[in-house]
Every structure is written in structure tokens, then in C-alpha cells.
UniProtKB/Swiss-Prot annotation:
GO terms for cellular component: cytoplasm. Pathway: Lipid metabolism; phospholipid metabolism. NCBIfam families: PRK13846.1 (NF010420). SUPFAM superfamilies: Isocitrate/Isopropylmalate dehydrogenase-like (SSF53659). Keywords: Cytoplasm, Lipid biosynthesis, Lipid metabolism, Phospholipid biosynthesis, Phospholipid metabolism, Transferase. One of its GO terms (molecular function) is phosphate:acyl-[acyl carrier protein] acyltransferase activity. The lineage of its organism: Bacteria, Pseudomonadati, Chlamydiota, Chlamydiia, Chlamydiales. InterPro entries: FA_synthesis, Phospholipid_synth_PlsX-like. This is Phosphate acyltransferase. It comes from Chlamydia pneumoniae (Chlamydophila pneumoniae).
Length: 320
């Protein structure tokens, strides 16, 4: 049975035609062993342009269905403005997902708008009060799962415990056989470090996960592979993620070709799928607004794998 993937062509930092070309590359690459099909959401102008000028890019049987939208959510739109655009490409894609016409929905658009619209249209799991954005980052021991990286500015300690459970389910989808370890991102490793909310979260994580909870970890220890799952609030997590991306881009510019290909691959966040909006009953994935080329290519392939692995059902079973 084909995995149905919906993709919002609009609203990212690049032209919709750049996203289209990546989709063509995915369809031609045969990189996935999982049968899949795309449904695209775009303005009428872009739909016509693709069907008139790029019809020869793919065989007719592989050509994706394109759904016309009246408008799209821009990067500068507030979440409230996004909600008012009821027929935007993002809103239509989430409607299709909610109606079970899709197994996953991907957007490179406005993060705040995507999370807000997804919460409005897609039910949360009963045990979840807030969703979290989850990403994988490379480490010396493989990779770590980090959440939240931007969905919530501040969270309650009990919500952080829920984030850890969702991270465990995600690692299981990646085929981890061992029991993953959990760390709390903080300004120091000692138990007393951080705010009162951090200290309360520390105690709750220790009570819930026992020896699997390693305690507080600092930002640098994340890349050492100190923990398999790193829990944080969205404000701190977003700063951490964007700093990591900036450091890698800095190294690329400074070292250029001196970085060997295998090292570049290990460091490059573009080889990891986009952020998963965890806690929703259906799979929503946010790829970076600047994503193009290998970044979006691997984000889409990763999304296909997560949809096939029934990530949302696994998360639910981990929460109840």
C-alpha cells in the first residue's frame, strides 16, 4: 500500500519550483523501497506553470496530484493571520491529513503558523497538552533526538516528561534496540542548576525513568553523545538548534573542501529529516524554510519512513 505524502509548495524561503525540482529528484531516485505518492498544495498560478512547463519532468503515472489553494501562509504572517487564511496551501494540506487522505504532511513554511494550524485541525493525543518540535542532530556516537526546538516558549515540568516519552517512541521507530538514555538540557550538570522549573523537571524525570535518566547535560555534551534523548523547552531548544546549524555553516565556509566528504556528511544536519510536530495524532513535519537540495531530499525520504513506521501510533502507545 502506498504511503501518501502531502507537501506544501508555498511559503518557504525558496521558490515553489525549487521544491518541485527536489520532488522530481525524489521520484526519480528510487532511494526509498517504500511505495509512496505525493499530493502537492500550491497556488493556481504555480499549479498551471508546473503542469504546462514541467509536464515532461516525470512519466504521467508518477506525476503528483496538485491541489489549488487560494493563498498561502507567508513567513511574516502571525499565527492568527494564518488561521484566517482558511484556504491556504498549508490549511488545505492539513485538512487532507485530518480527513485521512494523507499519511503525512510536510511544509517548509512558517513554523509558528504550522504548529498553530496543526493544533487547530489535528487532534492531540489524550495524554498530551502541547505538541513539541523534535529533531535529530549528529553526535560522536551517532545521533541524538532533541525536543522541544521551537513549538513552545515555556513548558511545565510534567509536559517535559511527556516530551521524553515521545522521544523514546521516536527512537524506537529508528530501530534502536537498547534502552535510550535521557538528558535535561541545562546550564550545568549539577542537580541544583537552572530555574525552579528545571529542578522540578529533573526530579520528575528521575522518578519516571530511573537509571535511563542521566541528569542535566550542557549543550556541548549533546554532541559528545552524552544522551540519546535531550529534553528542553522550545525557547532554549530553538536557540541551541540554530546555533548548531550556524556553527556548521561557519565551518563549511572556513574549511571548505578541507572537510572530507564523510565528515561533512556526519556533521551536516541536511542529512537528517525535518522537525516532527510530536504529540499530534497525525504526522506533520516541518522542514527548514531554507531547505533545498539535499536538505529537503532527505527530509522527504525520512518522512516517508516515519509514515510507514506509524510513528504517531507508536508515540500514543508510549504515552498511555
Amino acid at each position: 500500500m502506498e504511503v501518501q505524502i502531502g507537501i506544501d509548495l508555498m511559503g518557504g524561503d525558496h521558490s515553489p519550483l525549487v521544491v518541485w525540482q527536489v520532488l522530481v529528484d525524489v521520484l526519480k531516485s528510487q532511494s526509498s523501497t517504500i511505495p509512496f505518492a505525493f499530493t502537492l498544495f500550491a497556488s493556481e498560478e504555480i499549479r498551471k506553470q508546473i503542469q504546462e512547463e514541467f509536464i515532461s519532468d516525470l512519466p504521467q503515472e508518477k506525476f503528483p496530484k496538485i491541489i489549488s489553494a487560494e493563498n498561502f501562509v507567508a513567513m511574516e504572517d502571525s499565527p492568527l493571520a494564518a488561521i484566517r487564511k482558511k484556504s491556504s496551501s498549508m490549511a488545505l494540506g492539513l485538512d487532507y491529513l485530518q480527513e485521512d487522505k494523507l499519511d503525512a504532511f510536510i511544509s517548509t513554511g512558517n513554523t509558528g503558523a504550522l504548529v498553530t494550524l496543526a493544533r487547530a485541525k489535528i487532534p492531540l493525543f489524550p495524554a498530551v497538552s502541547r505538541p513539541a518540535l523534535l529533531v535529530c542532530v549528529p553526535t560522536m556516537r551517532g545521533h541524538a533526538v532533541i525536543l522541544d526546538v521551537g513549538a513552545n516558549i515555556s513548558v511545565k515540568p510534567e509536559e517535559m516528561v511527556g516530551f521524553a516519552r515521545m522521544g523514546l517512541a521516536y527512537r524506537q521507530c529508528l530501530g534502536d534496540s537498547k534502552i535510550p538514555t535521557i538528558g535535561l538540557l541545562n546550564i550545568g550538570s549539577e542537580e541544583r542548576k537552572g530555574t525552579e522549573a528545571h529542578r522540578q523537571t529533573f526530579r520528575m524525570l528521575r522518578e519516571t525513568f530511573g537509571e535511563a535518566f542521566l541528569g542535566n547535560i550542557e549543550s556541548g555534551a549533546v554532541f559528545d553523545g552524552a544522551a540519546d534523548i535531550v529534553v528542553t523547552d522550545g525557547f532554549t531548544g530553538n536557540i541551541f538548534l540554530k546555533t548548531a546549524e550556524g556553527v556548521f555553516e561557519f565551518l563549511q565556509r572556513i574549511l571548505g573542501d578541507k572537510l572530507e566528504a564523510d565528515i561533512q556528511r556526519r556533521l551536516d544536519y541536511t542529512f537528517y529529516p525535518g522537525s516532527v510536530v510530536c504529540g499530534l495524532s497525525k504526522l506533520v513535519i516541518k522542514c527548514h524554510g531554507k531547505a533545498c537540495g539535499s536538505s529537503l531530499f532527505h527530509g522527504i525520504l525520512g518522512s516517508i519512513n516515519l509514515a510507514q513506521a506509524r510513528l504517531c501510533k507508536r508515540i500514543l502507545s508510549n504515552l498511555i
